[in-house]
Regions:
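PLD/PLD-like phosphodiesterase catalytic module centered on the HKD motif
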Residues: 4-147
Length: 147
């Protein structure tokens, strides 16, 4: 999960390649943003990621600020890092790497509840957005290195 999901090309490629290998890659983003430009930027590259098998969900209760990563059934990461350029290159962030099956099970349970309160974004939904929204997403994505 990441409240600000505008990863650089390396992270986009890693997520996409994992999905193409058959890994269940799910990304949870908020339904409602607190930073509109960052939120709109994500929609510039989501169609390609979804087309390649990455599952994108929007958390329906609203804004979700957690930053959590679960790998298989044994490794979790919890911290302050968003999947965006500011976190990768500018902000001072910290994330705990926790190689523990019991903790991973607790994270899994938490995420399952979050996904139960979310809806999956479809390729069709993104394709049917008005042209002005598509153009706005692309324009804001150009600003992503400085957002």
């Amino acid at each position: 999960t990441s409240p600000y999901f505008v990863p650089d090309h390396g992270v986009q490629d890693a997520l996409t390649l994992a999905a193409l290998r058959g890994v269940d890659v799910r990304v949870l983003i908020p339904e409602r943003p607190d930073h509109l430009l960052v939120f709109l930027s994500a929609f510039a590259f989501l169609p390609e990621m979804i087309r390649n098998g990455v599952k994108i969900y929007r958390y329906q209760p609203g804004f979700l600020h957690q930053k959590v990563l679960l790998v298989d059934d044994h490794t979790s990461m919890v911290g302050t890092v968003n999947l965006d350029n500011r976190s990768f290159r500018l902000n001072f962030e910290v994330t705990a790497y926790i190689p523990d099956k019991i903790f991973a099970a607790a994270v899994f349970d938490m995420l399952e509840k979050d996904f139960a309160n979310s809806r999956q974004v479809s390729q069709r939904e993104l394709a049917e957005r008005p042209l002005w929204r598509k153009l706005l997403s692309r324009a804001t994505y150009l600003l992503s290195p400085v957002q």
